[in-house]
Amino acid sequence: MSAPAISIQNLTKIYPIPFKREKVVAVQDLSLAVEPGQVYGLLGPNGSGKSTTMKIVLGLVSPTAGKTEIFGRDSRTVESREDVGFLPENPYFYKFLTGSETLHFYGKICGLTGAKLRERTRELLALVGLENAADRRIGGYSKGMLQRIGLAQAMVQEPRLLVLDEPTAGVDPAGSREIRDLILDFKKRGITVLLCSHLLGQVQEICDRIGILHQGVLVREGKLDDLISIESQTELILENATPELLAEIQAAVAKSQARVVEQRKPQTTLERYFLEVTQKP
């Protein structure tokens, strides 16, 4: 059996407050696992410990107690991060470099050179849909384009694990949809994704499993479908149902102990509706 992509065991992080005898517990006794190939959503309100957890997994912050592993290797070691790509919230790029030069720069950091580096740069620009902006300076990119070049740099070394902190922050609905589709494409490629986001509708569309943090404590964790299912209700979706059939169903329900709580027409999502009326034909 293969090791989890991410294993977090009894993780605690406490920050002392300087010049005071007080402490802030950012994460408390957190344990969870992200299996290879999953898209895992780490959710919670601001200050719940999401970013702290991500930083500990990436070796950017040391834990007070507990341990984290990446594909079975201690995440504090440099070797464990060879298989990891990271997109932080609000990433900073050198604004006078072009998109192509930016990926070339990160490729060199990852040890790529020559023809392989040039080919990888072209592949990534195509992957994130920025071929036509390859020679434009980063300073002229929109927020959505910056996030996409950020995803491209996270993919430079062909990682098995992507850690994404608010990848759609500040992006309009069209850009958000493009990033969502990229994450789904990563999933098809077998890449594991640990995602932190406040956009719950998007999380519902792309995540296999979620964990919800509140005040540093994991309050809910499991498969998304299991967590959002309402056990006492059953949704019945019919196509081409005649009025007579609906009347028969309602009569059968009336004879039983169940009751019809709601009958309504299917709805699209606000995101889809917005895109339909704002995108050019």
Residue ranges, per PLM feature:
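ABC transporter nucleotide-binding domains
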Residues: 3-6, 13-195, 200-208, 212-214, ...
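Generic structural hydrophobic/aromatic packing signal, biased to beta-strands
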Residues: 1, 19-21, 236, 243
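Solvent-exposed beta-strand sheet faces enriched in polar/charged residues
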Residues: 9, 71, 264-266
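Short, charged/small-residue-rich alpha-helical element at the C-terminal edge
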Residues: 224-281
